[in-house]
């Protein structure tokens, strides 16, 4: 009886290992497929649009309205508009945010969900933000473009 129980447990164990390995291979395949769609710009910014939006393309001068979560490469969250229950808005191209935000958001449209990987030189550089973001840290932003306010010909927001 003990031998049958041990044999059954051994078979179950081997089956579990095989199932876990197949799951891991599937996940790796998904990651490979999704990261192959990532684009790296000449400046070093990498972006991946995980869900395509159907709204207008963002452009310099627009006020981009978005939700985001900012992460360090170790996975630690340092900021999130979701935590404040308030989307973040900024004028694209005005230099009021880190360079990687200006460059990355200009690649997106309303409704896009994207991941931006922003090298330190396009983020907070060698100074970082003490006790929050280390010097020259690469930052990861998970973004959802919620809306845009475009300037009209008169220069006033529409």
PLM-predicted stretches and their roles:
Residues 2-158:
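Cross-family detector of peptidyl-prolyl cis-trans isomerase
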């Amino acid at each position: 009886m003990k031998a049958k129980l041990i044999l059954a447990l051994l078979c179950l164990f081997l089956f579990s290992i095989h199932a876990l390995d197949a799951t891991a291979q599937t996940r790796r395949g998904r990651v490979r497929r999704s990261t192959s769609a990532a684009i790296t710009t000449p400046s070093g910014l990498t972006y991946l649009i995980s869900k395509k939006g159907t709204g207008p393309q963002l452009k310099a001068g627009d006020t981009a309205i978005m939700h985001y979560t900012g992460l360090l490469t170790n996975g630690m969250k340092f900021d999130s508009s979701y935590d404040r229950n308030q989307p973040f808005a900024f004028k694209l191209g005005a230099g009021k945010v880190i360079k990687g935000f200006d460059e990355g958001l200009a690649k997106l449209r309303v409704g896009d969900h994207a991941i931006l990987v922003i090298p330190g030189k396009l983020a907070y550089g060698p100074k970082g933000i003490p006790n929050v973001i280390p010097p020259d840290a690469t930052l990861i932003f998970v973004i959802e473009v919620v809306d845009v306010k475009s300037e009209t010909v008169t220069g006033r927001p529409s």
